Design a protein with these regions (language model features):
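Conserved amphipathic alpha-helix within the SDR
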Residues: 1-6
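Substrate-binding pocket helix/loop in short-chain dehydrogenase/reductase
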Residues: 22-23, 30-32
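Active-site loop immediately N-terminal to the catalytic Tyr-X3-Lys motif
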Residues: 24, 77-83, 141
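Active-site helix of classical SDR
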Residues: 46, 88
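Alpha-helical segment proximal to the catalytic Tyr-Lys
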Residues: 51, 101-104
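Residue(s) in the substrate-gating loop at a strand-loop-helix junction
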Residues: 72
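C-terminal helical subdomain
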Residues: 112-113, 120, 131-176
Length: 176
């Protein structure tokens, strides 16, 4: 990407996996998959992008760069049967805040976007009672569309250089 376009101005960490179920008797391989994608993927991608973002923040035309980490309202509120997913999203929020404090004075803005229910494949990775729970929520709620999240990201990264959006909730009106 850098070779093709010459610079990196924005990183959006959006990969995620949500495998729900009770902690007691859980399949720990599912935990490892969620930790690998939701936490380690974000860490490794951020680590690789940071030198390029710091350089872009020093240069014209923007003189600012952005990292937007996609978390979840599950990073703010814990629910039964969401334990490890909650863990990963609370971790994303904590990492985002720490990184924000480290690099914002160097003009790399770091923010977290925490969506509520969105029409994605995220819930389809579940089965049984958890899938029924997710399907019931989707049927009873006018959930967000991907464009709603894209609009939130665009809002965060297009503020003037002097303004940094550290946290943005985007919720379905029915869920708020």
């Amino acid at each position: 990407m850098i070779d093709q376009f010459g610079r990196l101005d924005v990183l959006v960490n959006n990969a995620g996996l949500m495998l729900l179920g009770p902690i007691v008797g859980a399949d720990v391989e599912e935990w490892e998959r969620m930790l690998s994608i939701n936490v380690q993927g974000l860490l490794y991608t951020t680590n690789a992008a940071l030198p390029h973002l710091l350089k872009a923040a020093e240069d014209d035309p923007r003189q600012v760069a952005d990292i937007v980490n996609i978390s979840s309202i599950a990073g703010r509120v814990a629910w039964a049967n969401y334990g490890v997913y909650n863990l990963t999203k609370f971790g994303v929020n904590g990492f985002t805040e720490s990184l924000r404090q480290e690099v914002t004075k160097r003009r790399v803005r770091v923010g977290v976007l925490e969506p509520g229910g969105v029409a994605t494949e995220l819930g389809t990775h579940n089965s049984g009672a958890m899938r029924e729970h997710i399907d019931a929520f989707v049927e009873s709620t006018e959930i967000l569309e991907a464009q709603d999240i894209a609009d939130g990201i665009a809002f965060m990264v297009t503020r003037p250089r002097r303004a940094s959006i550290a946290e943005l909730w985007v919720m379905p009106t029915d869920q708020a």
